A protein has these predicted regions:
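Signature of the first transmembrane helix
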Residues: 15-72, 164-165, 185
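Transmembrane-helix boundary and interhelical linker motifs in polytopic inner-membrane proteins
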Residues: 12-14, 45-49, 63-98, 146-151
Length: 202
C-alpha cells in the first residue's frame, strides 16, 4: 500500500498547517474590510461614482484576464513541480515572466486603442487603471505559491490592505475624490506586487 509521504513527514504537515492558517487569517481580513469601507465609500462617493468605478474596473479586469491566459496558474504548477531544483525553477521563472509580459502587452494594445486613445468619457479612470495592468504583469505571487511560501504573500497582502484602508479614510472625503479612490486601488496593487520582488531567492 502506497503511503502519502506528507503524512509521514511532520515537517511537511506543519508547513501545510501554517499555510492554511495564514490563508485563513487573510480570508477573514478580506471579508471584514469591506464591511468597514463599503458603507463609507458608498456614502461619500455616491451611487453614480460607485457605478463608474465598478464599470471601468470590470472592463480592465476583463483585459487582464484575457492577457493572463492562465499563465499564473501554469507558473504556479510548474514551480511547485520543480521547487527542489533551483536551476530549473529559476529558468522557468524567467520564461514565464517573458510570456506574461508578451500576452499582457497584446491585451494592453487593444485596451489602449479602445478605451484610452479617443474621446471615451471615462478615459481618465482607464488611464489610472493602466497601473493595475502593470501590477498584473509584475505579479509574482504565483512563484511563491509554487514554492509554498504563503507567509510572504499573506503578510504583504495584509499590510497593503491596511494601508489602503487608512488612505481611503484620510484622502477620500467627497464625491470629487473618485480619482483619488482609483489611485489608492491601483497604487496599492502596484506597490504590493513589486514588494515581492525583494524576496526572490538569490
Amino acid at each position: 500500500i502506497m503511503k502519502n509521504p506528507i503524512m509521514k513527514n511532520p515537517i511537511a504537515k506543519k508547513s501545510i498547517a501554517k499555510n492554511y492558517l495564514y490563508n485563513l487569517a487573510y480570508q477573514i481580513l478580506v471579508m471584514l474590510l469591506p464591511l468597514i469601507t463599503t458603507p463609507y465609500i458608498s456614502r461619500v462617493l455616491g451611487a453614480n461614482n460607485i457605478g463608474i468605478y465598478s464599470y471601468t474596473l470590470s472592463i480592465t479586469t476583463f483585459f487582464i484576464l484575457f492577457g493572463s491566459l492562465g499563465v499564473a496558474l501554469y507558473g504556479q504548477r510548474e514551480i511547485a513541480y520543480h521547487q527542489n531544483n533551483k536551476e530549473k525553477y529559476s529558468r522557468l521563472f524567467l520564461e514565464i515572466i517573458i510570456l506574461r509580459f508578451a500576452t499582457m502587452f497584446i491585451s494592453f494594445i487593444i485596451y489602449y486603442f479602445n478605451f484610452i486613445n479617443g474621446s471615451n468619457e471615462y478615459s481618465i479612470y482607464y488611464k489610472i487603471l493602466i497601473l493595475e495592468i502593470i501590477s498584473n504583469v509584475i505579479d509574482i505571487s504565483w512563484f511563491f505559491q509554487g514554492l509554498e511560501e504563503f507567509k510572504k504573500i499573506v503578510l504583504r497582502n495584509t499590510f497593503i490592505k491596511i494601508i489602503s484602508l487608512i488612505l481611503i479614510f484620510v484622502l477620500v472625503k467627497t464625491s470629487n475624490d473618485l480619482p483619488v479612490y482609483f489611485w489608492i486601488y491601483a497604487a496599492s496593487l502596484f506597490f504590493g506586487n513589486i514588494s515581492l520582488w525583494f524576496y526572490l531567492p538569490k
